[in-house]
Amino acid sequence: DKSGVMFTVDPVSKDAGRLVIEAVFGLGEGIVSGLITPHHYVIGRSDGAVLDEFVPVQLLAIMCDSESGGTQEVALDEVQGNSRVLSDGELGELRVMGLRLEACFGKPQDVEWCIRGGELSLLQSRPITTR
C-alpha cells in the first residue's frame, strides 16, 4: 500500500507543463507529519515522461493498526525501503486522474490519493493554494 499527494501544476515554479507527485509506502500521514521523506517525481503534463525524480531510502511506513484502531510505525525491510514507491504505470494513472480533476474543477489541483491492492483511489482534491 502507498499514498501521497499530487499537484497538477508545479507548486514551486508554477510551471503548468509539470505535475509533481510525492509518495510514501503506507499512509499519507508520514508525509503530512514530516516523519518520512517522500519520493518526489516531476512528470510531463503532455506525455507523462519522468522529468525529475528523487528516491530516498524509506525505512519506515505508517500503517493501520487493526488492534488499536489507530496507526503504527512499521519498519520496512531493506529491499522495500530501497525500492521506488511508484511504478511508471502508477505515475501514468495518477497523471490521468490529475488532469481529469483539473478539467472538472477548472483550476490546478492539490490531490491526495492512495493505492491499495493495486487500485488507485482519490481521497481529496482541492485548488492549489500555494502563493
Predicted regions and their residues:
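Conserved mixed alpha/beta core segments that line enzyme active sites in large multi-domain catalysts
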Residues: 1-131
